[in-house]
UniProtKB/Swiss-Prot annotation:
Record has Cell inner membrane as a keyword: yes
Membrane topology: Peripheral membrane protein
Taxonomy of the source species: Bacteria, Pseudomonadati, Pseudomonadota, Gammaproteobacteria, Alteromonadales
Protein name, per record: ATP synthase epsilon chain
Subunit structure: F-type ATPases have 2 components, CF(1) - the catalytic core - and CF(0) - the membrane proton channel. CF(1) has five subunits: alpha(3), beta(3), gamma(1), delta(1), epsilon(1). CF(0) has three main subunits: a, b and c.
Length: 142
């Protein structure tokens, strides 16, 4: 008996990052973590900056960083559209740490003309990238 799978396409503003059959997708939706498996009900939702974890047809896993975007689930296909998509090994950990530090400093020293939304987005994206890096480190240590 063949494993149940669904076609997944992960697309950034620049290119298609992943296209293939998967058994499971996990992303951070606007209302919390969301798991998508074959047969999932149709859905269209926003996704927050965070990790996308896929379990491929052969059981192997791959992890991506998404800057946020849109998730569309159809009966036989799933599409993830994001401005920025990085494979876990493409994330610059030091740059993410520095971006997190900058955003935290900006939030702490906010003035009257401060753009809170931009700083909060930068902080969320940096934290999400660091979580992806940490997840990969934990999986390698196993």
């Amino acid at each position: 008996m063949a494993a149940m799978t669904v076609q997944l396409d992960i697309v950034s503003a620049e290119s298609r990052i992943y296209s293939g059959l998967v058994a499971h997708l996990q992303v951070t939706g606007s209302e919390g973590d969301l798991g998508v498996m074959p047969g999932h009900a149709p859905l269209l939702t926003h996704i927050k900056p965070g990790m996308a974890r896929i379990v491929k047809q052969d059981g192997s896993e791959e992890v991506f960083y998404l800057s946020g975007g849109i998730l569309e689930v159809q009966p036989f296909s799933v599409s993830v559209l994001a401005d920025v998509v990085l494979r876990a090994d493409e994330i610059d950990e030091q740059a993410a740490v520095e971006a997190k530090r900058r955003a935290e400093t900006a939030l702490a020293d906010a003035g009257a003309d401060f753009n809170y939304a931009a700083a909060a987005i930068e902080l969320a994206q940096a934290i999400a990238q660091l979580r992806v890096v940490e997840t990969i480190k934990k999986n390698i240590a196993r």
